[in-house]
Curated annotation (Swiss-Prot):
Uppermost EC category: oxidoreductase
GO biological process: glycine decarboxylation via glycine cleavage system
GO terms, molecular function: glycine binding; glycine dehydrogenase (decarboxylating) activity; pyridoxal phosphate binding
Protein source organism: Thermotoga petrophila (strain ATCC BAA-488 / DSM 13995 / JCM 10881 / RKU-1)
Function, as annotated: The glycine cleavage system catalyzes the degradation of glycine. The P protein binds the alpha-amino group of glycine through its pyridoxal phosphate cofactor; CO(2) is released and the remaining methylamine moiety is then transferred to the lipoamide cofactor of the H protein.
Family according to the record: Belongs to the GcvP family. C-terminal subunit subfamily.
Oxidoreductase among keywords: yes
Name of the protein described by the UniProt record: Probable glycine dehydrogenase (decarboxylating) subunit 2
Enzyme Commission code: 1.4.4.2
Catalysed reactions, semicolon-separated: N(6)-[(R)-lipoyl]-L-lysyl-[glycine-cleavage complex H protein] + glycine + H(+) = N(6)-[(R)-S(8)-aminomethyldihydrolipoyl]-L-lysyl-[glycine-cleavage complex H protein] + CO2
Cofactor(s) listed: pyridoxal 5'-phosphate
Gene Ontology CC terms: cytosol; glycine cleavage complex
Binding partners and assembly: The glycine cleavage system is composed of four proteins: P, T, L and H. In this organism, the P 'protein' is a heterodimer of two subunits.
Record key words, sorted: Oxidoreductase, Pyridoxal phosphate
Length: 474
């Protein structure tokens, strides 16, 4: 039931007090011809409606959320408390810089900490998400070569295991995307060697990659990329695996984007809010978006980089997310962040060892923070697909993994338990997944018609795609 269906004419949740300010009528050209179709509900109606929806929803506060490549870790409530402090909550981006020195200091110090973590020289906090960070990075790449008069570089190389946003971001900027083949789940260095030429502007990599494998040839890849005059771009989606262990800048990357909403523990999902800062090495600092924050004596001020690509987001990005990430970093400290990565890798390998007993692991061996299993054998022998397995998992009150990604693995299940789950939770999740796989052989129709216990049963995704309904009509 929607909030509109609870509506009863004349029902009110509150009424405004009488005002001694004289009434003023807007010119007719600004007025609606008909009243807006807003629901008329009481306060209990509203509270019960949204409480009911919240109970039907699932979040990391309710249980494990092992979406691969999403880092759905538990988000400490302290972060929310700090972001809700009046000094952060009540400010406005149009205020003079001298009246928001605390906020500017926070942004400056956050930049400094993120640069130290990644090995970059400067950073912008403007981008609102990871893909937005990619787009910003690609704009910097384009402007960098344009400023050098090197306009023949039209290609960006992307591995076949990459996030789909990588080729999309490069294409949006006008680059031609060329795919690099994988060998044993990692970049095929020989194939990369064939593709690198004077037309290549950048190579985009995720390390660890989307299979949860560390690109062991990264130093060689960086050397090859730079020898041909191209830039090396780091998709920071999987930084949670290597904090305190290795830095993208030390691997040879020129540009890096981060996902503060993932690695640095701020709530995300359903489209946001996110934050995708972009860090660069010295030769690219002047191309960062404006405004940037710098320290001038005892004060913090805004400035415009000399060769800036311009704004990429209104004002200063998603500022509350920056506050939460800043809080998380200070709370964890250097040793704590390193421990985060150690536990993320340990949990992933423990869970993989459990799951490999009943599902195939195409690229087996030591993984980093996540791993990819395959239900291809299950599908061949039972007709049950990965999608059916994911839907059935919902009946056990937990969230399924990412499915059908990366594309180079058939019937893929991409699993990232994160560092915040304990052994008991991992054991229970493996037990549920094993039970579901067993059901696929014993009673496949149970999976093909799942879920059975959720408020909404299986949605007709084809119909939803072809005939979407975006608004309510009574």
């Amino acid at each position: 039931m929607t909030i509109f269906e609870r509506s009863k004419k004349g029902r009110k949740a509150f009424r405004l007090p009488e005002s001694d300010i004289p009434e003023y009528s807007l010119p007719n050209r600004f007025l609606r011809r008909t009243p807006p179709e807003l629901p008329e509900v009481s306060e209990p109606d509203v509270v019960r409606h949204y409480t009911d929806l919240a109970r039907k929803n699932y979040s990391v506060d309710r249980g494990i959320y092992p979406l691969g490549s999403c880092t759905m870790k538990y988000n400490p409530k302290l972060n929310e408390k700090v972001a809700n402090l009046e000094g952060f909550r009540e400010i406005h981006p149009y205020q003079p810089a001298e009246t928001v020195q605390g906020s500017l200091r926070l942004m400056y110090e956050l930049k400094e900490m993120l640069c130290e973590i990644t090995g970059m020289d400067d950073m912008t906090l403007q981008p609102a998400a990871g893909a937005h960070g990619e787009l910003t990075g690609m704009l910097i790449v384009r402007e960098y070569f344009k400023s050098r008069g090197d306009t023949g570089r039209k290609k960006v190389l992307v591995p076949d295991s990459a996030h789909g946003t990588n080729p999309a971001s490069a294409s949006m900027v006008g680059f031609e995307v060329v795919e690099i083949k994988s060998k044993n789940g990692m970049v095929d260095v020989e194939d990369l060697k064939k593709l690198l030429d004077e037309e290549v502007a950048a190579v985009m990599l995720t390390n660890p990659n989307t299979l949860g494998l560390f690109e062991k040839d990264i130093l060689k890849i960086a050397e090859m990329t730079h020898e041909c005059g191209a830039l090396l771009y780091y998709d920071g989606a999987n930084l949670n695996a290597v904090m305190g262990k290795v830095r993208p800048g030390d691997m040879g990357f020129d540009i890096v984007h981060l996902n503060l909403h993932k690695t640095f523990s701020t709530p995300h999902g359903m489209g946001g809010p996110g934050s995708g800062p972009v860090g660069v090495k010295k030769h690219l600092v002047d191309f960062l978006p404006f405004p940037q924050v710098r320290k001038n004596g005892e004060l913090y001020e805004l400035f415009v980089p000399e060769k800036t690509i311009g704004r990429v987001r209104s004002f200063f990005g998603n500022f509350p997310v920056l506050v939460k990430a800043y809080t998380y970093i200070l709370t964890m400290g250097r040793d704590g962040l390193e421990r985060v990565s150690e536990m993320a890798v340990l949990n992933a390998n423990y869970l993989k060892k459990k799951i490999e007993k009943f599902l195939e692991i195409p690229y087996n061996g030591f993984c980093m923070h996540e791993f990819v299993a395959s239900a291809e054998k299950v599908f061949r022998e039972t007709g049950v697909r990965t999608l059916d397995i994911a839907k059935r998992i919902l009946d056990f009150g937990v969230h399924p993994p990412t499915v059908y990604f990366p594309l180079i693995v058939l019937e893929a299940l991409m699993i990232e338990p994160t560092e915040t789950e304990n052994k008991e939770t991992l054991d229970k999740y493996a037990e549920i997944l094993e039970r579901v796989v067993k059901e696929a052989y014993e009673n496949p129709d149970v999976l093909k018609n799942a879920p059975h216990n959720t408020p909404v049963r299986r949605v007709d995704e084809v119909l939803a795609s072809k005939k979407p309904v975006f608004r309510w009509r009574g």
